[in-house]
Amino acid sequence: MKKVERFEVPRTIIFGPGALEKTPEVIPPSGRVLIITGKSSTRKYAERVAELLKQNCEIISYDQVELEKPGFDLVIGIGGGRPLDMAKVYSYIHKKPFVAIPTSASHDGIASPYVSFSLTQRFSKYGKISSSPVAIIADTSIILSAPSRLLKAGIGDLLGKIIAVRDWQLAHRLKGEEYSEYAAHLSLTSYKIAVGNAQKIKNFIREEDVRVLVKALIGCGVAMGIAGSSRPCSGSEHLFAHAIEVRVEKEDEVVHGELVALGTIIMAYLHGINWRRIKRIADIIGLPTSLRQANIDVDLALEALTTAHTLRPDRYTILGDGLSREAAKRALEDVELI
C-alpha cells in the first residue's frame, strides 16, 4: 500500500501590474501582522501594505527579526530572497501562515516552501524548515523595476532545472530514491519556458517579460511543494553554486542565479547533455559564461567542484562521490569556462 501524501502549495496567486493594491482581497483581517522586509528600498512597499491592510502591523528588516518572539497571527515577506526566507523561518517556527510579496524574481524562492542553503545550515536546530506561502502577490510593475541583472539571474536559476531533474532521475535509478513524475514535469516546463522565451524577454523592458519569468518561477515552487523537497529544482548545479557561496566573504559578491547557470553548463557536460546550447542561451540572456565574467577565481571554482558533493551527502547527483581536481579542471576547460 502506498503512503499517504500531503502537498503544500500556495492557495492564492495573483500577479500583474498593480497587484500590490489587491493585498486586502487576499489577506482577510488576521490580527497582528509581522511584515519582514529589506533594509531600505523595499520598505516603502511594506509601508503601503500596512496602510492597505488597516491592521495592527509591525514592519521589521529581515536582519532584525526576533525569531523566538511570539504574538503574531500572520507573517508577510516583502522583498528579495532574504526577507522572504526569514518570513518562512518565522512562519515555520511559530506555525503561522506566510504570504510572499516578491519585489524581484532572481530565483525560485519566491514560491518555494524552502529557504536558502546558508539559512538551512544556520537554523538547523529547527529541523527541516518548510513553509509554503498561503498566497503570493507578485506585482509585475514593481518586479520590472528591479535591477536587470537580478531578473536575468532568475533565468539562470531556471536553466538549472534540467540538471536537477536529471540528477533526481539518476538517484531514482541508482539509489531507489522516490521520484515524482508530476513534480519533475512541472520543473522541466519552467526550464522550457526560460529557453523558449530567452530571446524575447532577455532585456526585461516590458511587463510581459517579467510575467513570463514569474510564472515559470512560481511553477518551480509548486513543483517543490508537490515533491515535498527541493529535489525537482536543485541538483548538482545548485551544489556547485552553494559551494562557492559559502566560500565568499560577502554574500553580495556573487549572484545565485548566475552561479547556477555556470553550474548548469558544467553539469550538462558531465551528464552528456548539449551544454553548448545551454551556454548559448545563457549568453543570449546576458549571463556570465566564463569564470572571468562572473569574477570567480579558478582555484575557487575547482575547490567548489571537488567538494560540492559533500554539502548534501543525502542528495545523490552526477557528482557521485566527488570529482578529482584533474577531472574538475578538465571539465572547466572543455566547456570553456576557463
From Swiss-Prot:
<dbReference type="GO" id="GO:0008654">
    <property type="term" value="P:phospholipid biosynthetic process"/>
</dbReference>
<feature type="binding site">
    <location>
        <position position="242"/>
    </location>
    <ligand>
        <name>substrate</name>
    </ligand>
</feature>
<feature type="binding site">
    <location>
        <begin position="103"/>
        <end position="106"/>
    </location>
    <ligand>
        <name>NAD(+)</name>
    </ligand>
</feature>
<dbReference type="GO" id="GO:0005737">
    <property type="term" value="C:cytoplasm"/>
</dbReference>
<comment type="similarity">
    <text>Belongs to the glycerol-1-phosphate dehydrogenase family.</text>
</comment>
<keyword id="KW-0520">NAD</keyword>
<keyword id="KW-0963">Cytoplasm</keyword>
<keyword id="KW-0479">Metal-binding</keyword>
<keyword id="KW-0594">Phospholipid biosynthesis</keyword>
<dbReference type="InterPro" id="IPR032837">
    <property type="entry name" value="G1PDH"/>
</dbReference>
<feature type="binding site">
    <location>
        <position position="238"/>
    </location>
    <ligand>
        <name>Zn(2+)</name>
    </ligand>
</feature>
<comment type="function">
    <text>Catalyzes the NAD(P)H-dependent reduction of dihydroxyacetonephosphate (DHAP or glycerone phosphate) to glycerol 1-phosphate (G1P). The G1P thus generated is used as the glycerophosphate backbone of phospholipids in the cellular membranes of Archaea.</text>
</comment>
<feature type="binding site">
    <location>
        <position position="256"/>
    </location>
    <ligand>
        <name>Zn(2+)</name>
    </ligand>
</feature>
<protein>
    <recommendedName>
        <fullName>Glycerol-1-phosphate dehydrogenase [NAD(P)+]</fullName>
        <ecNumber>1.1.1.261</ecNumber>
    </recommendedName>
</protein>
<feature type="binding site">
    <location>
        <position position="108"/>
    </location>
    <ligand>
        <name>substrate</name>
    </ligand>
</feature>
<keyword id="KW-0521">NADP</keyword>
<keyword id="KW-0443">Lipid metabolism</keyword>
<dbReference type="InterPro" id="IPR016205">
    <property type="entry name" value="Glycerol_DH"/>
</dbReference>
<dbReference type="GO" id="GO:0046872">
    <property type="term" value="F:metal ion binding"/>
</dbReference>
<dbReference type="GO" id="GO:0106358">
    <property type="term" value="F:glycerol-1-phosphate dehydrogenase (NADP+) activity"/>
</dbReference>
<dbReference type="Pfam" id="PF13685">
    <property type="entry name" value="Fe-ADH_2"/>
</dbReference>
<feature type="binding site">
    <location>
        <position position="157"/>
    </location>
    <ligand>
        <name>Zn(2+)</name>
    </ligand>
</feature>
<feature type="binding site">
    <location>
        <position position="112"/>
    </location>
    <ligand>
        <name>NAD(+)</name>
    </ligand>
</feature>
<keyword id="KW-0862">Zinc</keyword>
<feature type="binding site">
    <location>
        <begin position="81"/>
        <end position="85"/>
    </location>
    <ligand>
        <name>NAD(+)</name>
    </ligand>
</feature>
<keyword id="KW-0560">Oxidoreductase</keyword>
<dbReference type="InterPro" id="IPR023002">
    <property type="entry name" value="G1P_dehydrogenase_arc"/>
</dbReference>
<keyword id="KW-1208">Phospholipid metabolism</keyword>
<dbReference type="GO" id="GO:0106357">
    <property type="term" value="F:glycerol-1-phosphate dehydrogenase (NAD+) activity"/>
</dbReference>
<comment type="subunit">
    <text>Homodimer.</text>
</comment>
<comment type="pathway">
    <text>Membrane lipid metabolism; glycerophospholipid metabolism.</text>
</comment>
<dbReference type="GO" id="GO:0006650">
    <property type="term" value="P:glycerophospholipid metabolic process"/>
</dbReference>
<keyword id="KW-0444">Lipid biosynthesis</keyword>
<feature type="binding site">
    <location>
        <position position="157"/>
    </location>
    <ligand>
        <name>substrate</name>
    </ligand>
</feature>
